[in-house]
């Protein structure tokens, strides 16, 4: 039996982190968690990490697409925070962001890790950005590191 699974060390990986500025008091914690995870667990060097800042979650897919089209990166982490309000705006923003990022991954055959919080309350978002529910930015980085390795292994085995 042949099993393909990735580990999290990816010393030579070039990673772009596309970050929404909206709700920055939360998103900066996600960014810190992602960078810390890339460096500590993935052994990714500073010079191999590029941070791209965009206004909000809706802009994440376009920036991720441009990064992917450059061909210079092994993976992308998208970070943001969309918190439900009293209007349907949340559903549109969260849905389009998710759909757009998935499309980038499939179009460019590149791992795009979804680290965008989509919560009902600000308290839930705070819990997921580094307090009692962990740091979803760090979790997104772990997922990305593993997928970078899985895709590299698949490329070797299938070529």
UniProtKB/Swiss-Prot annotation:
Pathway: Cofactor biosynthesis; riboflavin biosynthesis; riboflavin from 2-hydroxy-3-oxobutyl phosphate and 5-amino-6-(D-ribitylamino)uracil: step 1/2. Its EC number is 2.5.1.78. GO terms for biological process: riboflavin biosynthetic process. One of its GO terms (molecular function) is 6,7-dimethyl-8-ribityllumazine synthase activity. The active site is at 89 (proton donor). It comes from the Bacteria. It catalyses: (2S)-2-hydroxy-3-oxobutyl phosphate + 5-amino-6-(D-ribitylamino)uracil = 6,7-dimethyl-8-(1-D-ribityl)lumazine + phosphate + 2 H2O + H(+). One of its GO terms (cellular component) is riboflavin synthase complex. Keywords: Riboflavin biosynthesis, Transferase. The keyword Disulfide bond does not apply. Coiled coil: none annotated. Disulfide bonds: none annotated. (2S)-2-hydroxy-3-oxobutyl phosphate binds at residues 86-87, 128. 5-amino-6-(D-ribitylamino)uracil binds at residues 22, 57-59, 81-83, 114. Forms an icosahedral capsid composed of 60 subunits, arranged as a dodecamer of pentamers. Belongs to the DMRL synthase family. Catalyzes the formation of 6,7-dimethyl-8-ribityllumazine by condensation of 5-amino-6-(D-ribitylamino)uracil with 3,4-dihydroxy-2-butanone 4-phosphate. This is the penultimate step in the biosynthesis of riboflavin. This is 6,7-dimethyl-8-ribityllumazine synthase. It comes from Shewanella denitrificans (strain OS217 / ATCC BAA-1090 / DSM 15013). The lineage of its organism: Bacteria, Pseudomonadati, Pseudomonadota, Gammaproteobacteria, Alteromonadales. The gene is ribH.
